[in-house]
Amino acid sequence: MTAFDKDQVSRFRFVRCDFAADTGVAQLVYAFDDGPEMTETVTVPGAPFQLDGDRAAAVQRALQLLHLIAGVSYYKAAVPAQVSIDSYAIDAATAALVETVYFNGLGEFAYRNGLNLRDRFKLPVTEPLSPRERGWGEGASAPNLNLTHHALVAIGGGKDSLVSIEALRNAGVAETVTWIGGSQLIRACAERTGLPTLNIGRTLAPELFELNRQGAWNGHIPVTAVNSAIMVLAAVVQGMDQVVFSNERSASYGSQIAGTGEVNHQWSKGWAFEKAFGEYVQQYIAADLNYYSLLRPLSELAVARQFAKTDFYDAHFSSCNRNFHILGERPVNRWCGVCPKCHFVFLALAPFMPKMRLVRIFGRNLLDDSEQAGGYDALLEFQDHKPFECVGEGKESRAAMATLASRPEWKEDVLVKRFANLIQPTLSADELQIEPLLVIDGEHRIPAALWERLRANFAA
């Protein structure tokens, strides 16, 4: 591979994409200028698949959407001003969705690298596309595919997806626990559920890692957007009518950066993405394919309260991000105890479960370790901004800490005592109440009949 100079790249190309029904393998091909092709593969287990008529056309539409969204991993290496699609045409609605994903989903990447990406990524639009060109037949929107009533539920190994899986089980929804990639931790968690599983393969183009070694731009991408597109493709291929994630309402709020404004590390876990993506899927891919987050009405603390109701997964789950880097070491234990995710999950669970149970899960008491003060200050938004991690809002951390400060078994721990002495006196008592943060919100895409079955359980 010739030397890569990101400043000399002028164009990013979506070269082509294809899906082989006999093997279940999707190939997503990209390139910079006239450089070597970069091919990512996604493998849906269960081949061969019988795909014809409307379903085959829907697979093609889902494949193109995945091709466009997954390209973010490669585009970011050089962020050139020109973009082309070599092998198919898209309309304005598709371009608008994907451009929104790139701009917002690369927000943290742009901030950390000092880049301004506003209006930079623009897709070529072909208007108008006829219903036949879209693969809709003669309809005004995507057809109903008569998909089987069955949910593909994303599992990430943490508490959130396990709450969703158990809620769907209790509601009588047929579900398959689904994950992407080779994490053994996630596999163990998935197997612990006792439900059918689907492990989708994803292999990034090896050239991408070489570009990174040669000085490409690198950083955070909207991975939930990519995983959502992968699972929509899998659902259409498998003939299932629901793709379920476990993103709570706290994900919609980012970090407030002085002089910059809001930067949301988890934008593609937020409501704006879920709404836009879910509506697009139903209008353009399959009318009866529902994409939604089961936990959208809940705060992080409300999810923690639900998780604490059972200890069935205590020895299996982990939200520690050090377990999930593409490259790099994994900790020997499931919780490193020093990253923002460990800090937040410990704090969020503390009000809702016995102290000894929580310490047993983590292997130690994180709130009785003075060296963790800086990490907790960031969660509390005390002299720092919320970390660029998938953690709850500052007000949730403050309310949880205030709750612990009032409890005999916690109030003598060094960081709880520090909060009570140093931080709590600067805050109003009203904003430290935990109960208002447990109230269910009305903004979600959960199918109405399912929500009626879930609502009472989530409120308690």
Residue positions per predicted region:
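Long, compositionally biased low-complexity repeat segments characteristic
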Residues: E127-R132, A460
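Class I SAM-dependent methyltransferase "Motif I" SAM/SAH-binding loop
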Residues: I155-G156
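Hydrophobic/small residue at the entry helix of a nucleotide-binding pocket
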Residues: D160
